[in-house]
Structure formats: C-alpha cells, structure tokens
C-alpha cells in the first residue's frame, strides 16, 4: 500500500548561488557521509549532486507528510548510492520500502519518493503529496 508520495524540483542556478554565498549551506543539507562524496566530485558535478540531494530530501519529507521543519531535518535524511550509483534513502522503518528517483537536466534537479508499507493497514495511513 502506498502511504506517501513526494516530489521536488530545484533550479541548479539557485543551488549554485546559495553555495557561492554561504558554504555552511553544505553542512545544513548534507550528512557527513554525503559531504565526503561531494568533496570527491569535480566542481561542475558538485552542484548537480547537491541539488539532487536537496530535492530528494525535500521529496522524502513531503512523502512523510511533514515537510522539512520541526519533525524532520535535512540531517535526518541520508541518501546513499549502491555500487551502480542508484540512490536510496538510508532511513527505513519496519515494513516500509522507500522508492527514490533523482534526475538532472541542464537547469534542474528533480526527485520523487514513494513510500510503501507492507502488512495490515493502519488507520493513520494516508497518501500525502
């Protein structure tokens, strides 16, 4: 059963501007492990990476139904990649599968998250978007 859907799109130029004005933006958005990955990338790829992670975390928070804020922060959400580069969200709750897709164009990064729960439905289960 799908219990949450979230999508987010961000302009690469906006992320580039935030990064140029305040490098602390990185520490707010990326976990230490994500920051290690970021630091190993070529400068041209860093903005795409950061924008994709930003969009993925926003999409996940929307799928949870909370958004980024009081209940979940950027640091609570970690995006990891498998050996083939496929991203996934490290946070998992029992009985849930989180589907994540991140894509980039020349100007934008977009991410979509779908949260599925297996087992008996709970009264609190509802789709958010």
UniProtKB/Swiss-Prot annotation:
Reaction catalysed by this enzyme: apo-[ACP] + CoA = holo-[ACP] + adenosine 3',5'-bisphosphate + H(+)
SUPFAM superfamilies attached to this UniProt entry: 4'-phosphopantetheinyl transferase
Entry annotated with the keyword RNA-binding: no
Keyword terms, alphabetized: Cytoplasm, Fatty acid biosynthesis, Fatty acid metabolism, Lipid biosynthesis, Lipid metabolism, Magnesium, Metal-binding, Transferase
Cofactor requirement: Mg(2+)
Cellular localisation: Cytoplasm
GO biological process per UniProt: fatty acid biosynthetic process; lysine biosynthetic process via aminoadipic acid
Residues engaged in binding Mg(2+): 8, 58
Any GO molecular function: holo-[acyl-carrier-protein] synthase activity
Annotated InterPro entries: 4-PPantetheinyl_Trfase_dom, 4-PPantetheinyl_Trfase_dom_sf, ACPS, P-Pant_transferase_sf, Ppantetheine-prot_Trfase_dom
EC number annotated for this UniProt entry: 2.7.8.7
Keyword Transferase (UniProt): yes
Predominant cellular place of this UniProt entry's protein: cytoplasm
Top-level taxon: Bacteria
GO cellular component term of the entry, any: cytosol
Recorded family membership: Belongs to the P-Pant transferase superfamily. AcpS family.
Function: Transfers the 4'-phosphopantetheine moiety from coenzyme A to a Ser of acyl-carrier-protein.
Identification of the protein by name: Holo-[acyl-carrier-protein] synthase
Organism of this sequence: Geobacillus thermodenitrificans (strain NG80-2)
């Amino acid at each position: 059963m799908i219990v949450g859907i979230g999508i987010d799109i961000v302009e690469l130029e906006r992320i580039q501007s935030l990064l140029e004005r305040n490098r602390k933006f990185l520490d707010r958005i990326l976990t230490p492990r994500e920051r290690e990955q970021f630091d190993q990338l070529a400068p041209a790829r860093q903005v795409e990476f950061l924008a994709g992670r930003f969009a993925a975390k926003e999409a996940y928070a929307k799928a949870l139904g909370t958004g980024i804020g009081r209940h979940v922060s950027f640091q609570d959400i970690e995006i990891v990649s498998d050996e083939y580069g496929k991203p996934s969200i490290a946070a998992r709750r029992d009985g849930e599968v989180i589907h994540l897709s991140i894509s980039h164009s020349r100007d934008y990064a977009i991410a979509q998250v779908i949260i599925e729960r297996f087992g008996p439905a709970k009264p609190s289960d509802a789709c958010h978007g």
